[in-house]
A protein has these predicted regions:
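Short, charged beta-turn/beta-strand-edge "cap" motif at the junction between a beta-strand
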Residues: 116-119
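Short, charged/polar surface micro-motifs in flexible loops or helix N-caps
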Residues: 58-60, 68-72, 91-92, 136-139
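Short, conserved beta-strand element in jelly-roll/cupin
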Residues: 66-68, 77-94, 133-134
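Short acidic-glycine-tyrosine-enriched beta hairpin
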Residues: 98-114
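A short, N-terminal "cap"/entry segment at the start of jelly-roll beta-barrel domains
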Residues: 1-64, 74-75, 145-160
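Asparagine-centered strand-capping/turn motif at beta-strand->loop junctions
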Residues: 121-123
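Short strand-connecting beta-turns/loops that link adjacent beta-strands
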Residues: 58-60, 80, 99, 125-126
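A short hydrophobic beta-strand segment most commonly corresponding to one strand
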Residues: 65, 111, 126-144
Length: 160
């Protein structure tokens, strides 16, 4: 005998059955692998500087970035998203809008809110590795740095 709750139960079961699409998992060496060994990526990429996309989909971008001692990136900011990093090796320094400097080492996390000019440099004596987490399309808007006065658009060695 049917009850007033049968249609509700059917609706719930139907909703669960048509849930999210399973993840798109790459079987090769590209992004979106279920398991990535950082040491294998480092060995395959060779000497820094380099970056390798680890995860890329419509909601997130995760990039492994290696910098040599004194290496760094150009000052920039993001309009659409906050960015954060997990330091996996070395010692890095973030220079931020508002005369803020953050120094981070292995196993530390740095978060920078959208609209904040920032650049990162390796201040240690060894290779630095960090995972950068962003939101696609991860547009970068390049800008001068208040703290260091850096305005050139070219690469720079940060240990002068």
């Amino acid at each position: 005998m049917a009850t007033e709750f049968d249609s509700i139960a059917t609706l719930i079961i139907r909703d669960l059955a048509s849930g999210p699409t399973p993840p798109r998992v790459a079987s090769g060496s590209g992004p979106n692998r279920l398991h990535t060994r950082v040491a294998e990526v480092v060995a395959a990429m060779g000497p820094p500087p380099w970056s390798r996309r680890i995860i890329a989909d419509e909601r997130q971008l995760v990039t492994l970035i290696a910098s040599p001692p004194c290496g760094g990136n150009r000052p920039h900011w993001h309009r659409e998203f906050d960015e954060w990093w997990v330091v996996l090796a070395g010692e890095l320094e973030w220079e931020l809008t508002g005369d803020v400097v953050v120094r981070a080492r292995k196993d530390e996390i740095v978060w920078v809110p959208r609209g904040t000019v920032h650049h990162i440099r390796n201040v240690g004596q060894e290779l630095s590795l960090r995972l950068a987490v962003a939101m696609p399309p991860a547009m970068h808007y390049f800008s001068a740095c208040e703290q260091c006065g850096y305005t050139d658009d070219g690469p720079r060695e940060w240990c002068a």
